[in-house]
Amino acid sequence: MPPKKFKDLNSFLDDQPKDPNLVASPFGGYFKNPAADAGSNNASKKSSYQQQRNWKQGGNYQQGGYQSYNSNYNNYNNYNNYNNYNNYNNYNKYNGQGYQKSTYKQSAVTPNQSGTPTPSASTTSLTSLNEKLSNLELTPISQFLSKIPECQSITDCKNQIKLIIEEFGKEGNSTGEKIEEWKIVDVLSKFIKPKNPSLVRESAMLIISNIAQFFSGKPPQEAYLLPFFNVALDCISDKENTVKRAAQHAIDSLLNCFPMEALTCFVLPTILDYLSSGAKWQAKMAALSVVDRIREDSANDLLELTFKDAVPVLTDVATDFKPELAKQGYKTLLDYVSILDNLDLSPRYKLIVDTLQDPSKVPESVKSLSSVTFVAEVTEPSLSLLVPILNRSLNLSSSSQEQLRQTVIVVENLTRLVNNRNEIESFIPLLLPGIQKVVDTASLPEVRELAEKALNVLKEDDEADKENKFSGRLTLEEGRDFLLDHLKDIKADDSCFVKPYMNDETVIKYMSKILTVDSNVNDWKRLEDFLTAVFGGSDSQREFVKQDFIHNLRALFYQEKERADEDEGIEIVNTDFSLAYGSRMLLNKTNLRLLKGHRYGLCGRNGAGKSTLMRAIANGQLDGFPDKDTLRTCFVEHKLQGEEGDLDLVSFIALDEELQSTSREEIAAALESVGFDEERRAQTVGSLSGGWKMKLELARAMLQKADILLLDEPTNHLDVSNVKWLEEYLLEHTDITSLIVSHDSGFLDTVCTDIIHYENKKLAYYKGNLAAFVEQKPEAKSYYTLTDSNAQMRFPPPGILTGVKSNTRAVAKMTDVTFSYPGAQKPSLSHVSCSLSLSSRVACLGPNGAGKSTLIKLLTGELVPNEGKVEKHPNLRIGYIAQHALQHVNEHKEKTANQYLQWRYQFGDDREVLLKESRKISEDEKEMMTKEIDIDDGRGKRAIEAIVGRQKLKKSFQYEVKWKYWKPKYNSWVPKDVLVEHGFEKLVQKFDDHEASREGLGYRELIPSVITKHFEDVGLDSEIANHTPLGSLSGGQLVKVVIAGAMWNNPHLLVLDEPTNYLDRDSLGALAVAIRDWSGGVVMISHNNEFVGALCPEQWIVENGKMVQKGSAQVDQSKFEDGGNADAVGLKASNLAKPSVDDDDSPANIKVKQRKKRLTRNEKKLQAERRRLRYIEWLSSPKGTPKPVDTDDEED
């Protein structure tokens, strides 16, 4: 409540003396008293309001009088003639312009008028409107337009609108050009003025809706409808709901007229211009809704072409001062940005949009971007999002030196990943000044140096690429020139719709834009449909569109792919298609073209969709691919057989549906031709090694007499001799077309005639083998060198191993081990002995089926030897990546990688270790657990309940045993030898595993954020690790999951069985560098000589059940792009001349340093006597005898 000495405004005004010159209005406010004016009607003393009432009555302004006024209006051109009427003697003072200031003036204290126009105001706006209409040029629809302001109901308005549309339907008027000629947009702009009656404004929207419906389906006449969008959007902010609804209907009708590509290239720029204008915020909200609808209705690849123009405008809207508009603008921008398919950026879209809206988040955003391993190709849409943030970071005065360092690194990385210079051309002028500023002003030399490198990359001159070479994307000018050149050749018959518009600039511009965008996204089918609709549906016009337009455009885009000549070969496949997996688009509107007898190498990064493409072909799911009756395809891949594993080889192949008519003799002959003798054919499928299983698949393909062989990593499990055989087989059969996915560069060099490369969701074709491809595309040099420039892996350092102070001490050992599988006639391994240290870099080599994997399984404890013993340090942790990576995750396809790792280690132990054969408790061993033993401690026989502790005892350990039915205070410490002697070896081993795992996990937090960081360290993107089920991952991504799982508990030894099988070249290089720089021991089985030769100085040759250890003088570090690391573990020159393991009798190889014994006096006398006698003996020896060395060792 206000203090009493103050009055509210109403009380204050009531207390004021009455002004004789002002008269109160019943609607609020005051009118000037006409009696106070010299030139007014002073004959009456009534109030101004009463005077107005009398004026209205005297002017016959009742309904009947107004109708009379309307009826007389048609006889006059404007309101100036109204001064001839007797009842309006005073009306000539206004001349149709409303009240003059001398007769009506709003008082300073008069509140604003309501939104509802008074009768006089409506009359005034109608007067103004009709005057403007009369000043326009006369057109066939002028008379109908002029009657709309006179209509009393919406029905009357619709009748006039119907007449207007009928006028468009008359011969000669049915072209959209009449919209411009009759200046309909100008008329409607006057209709929607706020002072006009709502009926007139609503009629304007109905005219737009009806015109849009009339021209719908008549391409390219919709080009003339574009100006109507601004008129309709302006009316969205109208105060009358009927007008708003009509405006929304008009916008929907307009949008329905345009084809999809026109929405993005023609309509969207108009909406963006409207958003940049000074329109009302309600109208801009409607414009954002139009943007959302275009986003929902259009293809993503078309929308990506608009990012450069759309993102800045939508960012401005998202930062508008009007809260409602800014909120909707932010949502629209985020949804718009999210259509971009970029795995590197997709987890950070929200942060990017937040940064665009709020510049204070630039440091956080730059820090996040600097931690991204950019792998996906960088395109114009990606740069449209990142360049504004990077540019702001470069120019902010508050940017720290660390932030500038991160920014210039991101700029350099992005620029290097741009395959097409045109993608970044428009952004270089934005980035150059900021980078140059950092070069000139940065305080740290390191930042200046990095900025200099980024500057050089930005300024790189690529004139060689520009010389007479198509840039890969049509510009609008090029599209226009192409259209005009080909329109000259058109046969304009009666069915050709475009004939009247061939010289019309509006239509030419419209068609040029559509031709350009459809060509740039390679959507030839949609472009052909549009041009056919424009030029007519006759056979001659269809042929003209297909040959003159589509064929010539495709030739322009595929210059490097020569079309078939007589001597090139027979074309067997030529189809356009798109390929998606789940929600991810792998290939978008690309072309697959195969020639008979050619061998195509399919190259691309992990997850690009190489195997998915081949599987789609094999399953008949690829659009346009010939059916199996026309073209036989056979998909050859290495796969695990489940219930079929117990079948013999002939029966296994005979089960194939396509080989039902093939005799068993023919099957046996085919198997014999690929190396299966009678003894091998008698084996079961499950007993075959990986290499023989692959040969089995190849034999099946031969029997099917396939026209196209689809080979997915055919050399993965083949030894050198079998790879040679496969190469010769493919080279000999020139009638078979092959599509090959392989990361073996030597194999691709030998067999390929063409390379198909994945580039920005398209298939690019290169003639020649892999070497020729690298010459044409130097950035693909990673196929010949091991580099981590495109992908990185980092392994956690191994933990401390108790008692092992030297990296050359043995930590795992096999002694005289013999092993044979159940039912086998001869042992797989016989009398094998070997040992490993923390510095070991061992390659296990040998032919398929020689027993390499068996040796590794025995060493890691997956198998138990029949004879001999396998010993290892009790705390030794081994990370094992099996030959078939899927076997680790086969039962967890529904889990994400993050969830799988949590499951695997949630109880502190590695669950995969517990599944090994050496850890499983047999029935006999379970029975033994109930056996009571006596350890001679005076308490008699007792049964063991569990082992609960461990401590050192001499050169071994003793274990704390909890006895069944005895309290913990009666626990006993029992030596390991005693427990093993009584048969509790697996119980001891289980506890050792638990202790080793606990020690390794001591520094690990099993929480999602830490696990995500661990996956990123091994090269798996966080988005995939956290949100993609394992069943949806590619082979290369699954291998990374298995590697991450094996490395989680910081192992000391890493055992890799065919690690290169599923990895692409980038990931292979990253793995090689990670192994080289890791400080633990490594054992690997691999037929990849390049990989093994660059890493392993020691080799174990396994053949015929025997193993031979062999050392090499040096490793070939030239395979690494960075020249190698001479200081890497296991590769130092000092280690090459001697074995990597110092052997002794201890399983843990913990040598105890002997303490030097002090000699007694008698011992010293005896020592001196020995030395004297030795010296005398030397003096009496022949001349030239070397002097013996004094030593305390009696034997010496």
From Swiss-Prot:
Keywords: Amyloid, ATP-binding, Cytoplasm, mRNA transport, Nucleotide-binding, Nucleus, Phosphoprotein, Prion, Repeat, Transport
Low complexity: compositionally biased ranges: 114-125
Purpose: May be involved in the mRNA export process. Forms the [NU+] prion and induces [PSI+] prion formation.
Gene: NEW1
Domain ABC transporter: 570-786, 812-1129
Chromo domain ranges (all copies): 942-1003
Classification of source organism: Eukaryota, Fungi, Dikarya, Ascomycota, Saccharomycotina
GO molecular function: ATP binding; ATP hydrolysis activity; mRNA binding; ribosome binding; translation factor activity, RNA binding; translation termination factor activity
GO cellular component: cytoplasm; mitochondrion; nucleus
Family: Belongs to the ABC transporter superfamily. ABCF family. EF3 subfamily.
Region (Disordered), start-end ranges: 1-49, 103-125, 1137-1166, 1177-1196
Phosphothreonine PTM positions: T1191
Location(s), subcellular: Cytoplasm; Nucleus
Residue sites binding ATP 2 per the record: G846, P847, N848, G849, A850, G851, K852, S853
Record protein name field: [NU+] prion formation protein 1
UniProt organism field: Saccharomyces cerevisiae (strain ATCC 204508 / S288c)
Amino acids binding ATP 1: G604, R605, N606, G607, A608, G609, K610, S611
Domain-related comment: The N-terminal 153 residues are responsible for the prion properties of NEW1.
